[in-house]
Regions:
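Intrinsically disordered, low-complexity polar regions and short flexible loop motifs
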Residues: 19-257
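Sec-dependent bacterial lipoprotein signal peptides
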Residues: 1-19
């Protein structure tokens, strides 16, 4: 009888241990920030930077050794690979700080106070032409009204103007390479401003921006694929007086959704 009781007790212990081993475990978690933001280094001639919200670094590049790389986000690039980063709602001072080692490491070269609202999306741009004497660049922020798609045959496209020395408002056009239909994206846009989103049928497009009083392309980009159900921001950057090279005017294509 005692042997049966011992066996029963052992079986019970095994069952309990099995239950405990396979029980659902509650993992520690932290509340995700309620807003999202992208960061772009469009400051012509600016050094590579890391981006900060107040004193918290929100973008950085790792290295093969596991430590932070000093390469940072170079001109024309986006922080965190161009995807959104979580940020807490509230008042923030957003900065781009020099990433390279040396006397100017972590020096803020672009500073912008901003109010971040819960549940909203934003894009922060270093812009204009970097001042090598004062070691400063312009900066601005725009809200990204990201919404779920309602039509998968079209995309929503907008235009952001980050060229400081454009002498007139710029309008972005999208020429469909299949049927030659031209779509105007928003309207004439000033420096540090964004158009609204415009519905554009899915396809391949040649993009170009012109002054409102001209038929000459000031900046262009060909063979851009626009997918239905997506949202895109076309950003103009560069030095309007430069004809070619890395600082010449360029159009950046970034998916918001």
């Amino acid at each position: 009888m005692n042997s049966h009781r011992i066996v029963a007790a052992l079986l019970g212990a095994i069952v309990l241990a099995s239950c405990e081993k396979n029980a659902v475990q509650v993992l520690p978690s932290a509340e995700l920030p309620g807003a999202r933001i992208k960061f772009f280094n469009f400051g012509v001639g600016a050094p590579a930077v890391n981006f900060y919200a107040n004193d918290t670094k929100v973008t950085a590049i790792g290295s093969g050794t596991g430590s932070e790389s000093s390469s940072g986000v170079a001109y024309g690039g986006g922080g965190a690979g161009g995807v959104y980063t979580g940020i807490a709602p509230g008042q923030h001072t957003l900065t781009g700080r020099i990433s390279a080692a040396g006397a100017d490491k972590n020096l803020p070269i672009a500073t912008l106070p901003a109010t971040i609202e819960d549940g909203k999306y934003y894009s922060f741009y270093m812009s204009g032409i970097y001042n090598t004497t004062t070691k400063t660049s312009d900066a601005f922020i725009v809200e990204d009204p990201v919404v779920p798609p309602t039509d998968y045959t079209t995309a929503q496209v907008r235009f952001v103007q980050a060229i400081s020395n454009a002498t007139n408002l710029l309008t972005l056009y999208a020429l469909n390479t299949t049927d030659s239909t031209t779509t105007t994206i928003g309207g004439p846009i000033a420096y540090k401003a964004a158009s609204g989103f415009t519905a554009v049928p899915a396809g391949i497009y040649n993009l170009y921006a012109r002054y409102t009083d001209s038929t000459t392309n000031k900046v262009s980009r060909n063979a851009v694929t626009i997918l239905g159900g997506r949202m895109y921001t076309i950003g103009a950057r560069g030095n309007i007086t430069v004809a070619s090279g890395t600082t010449a005017p360029a159009l950046d294509n970034t998916a918001n959704r």
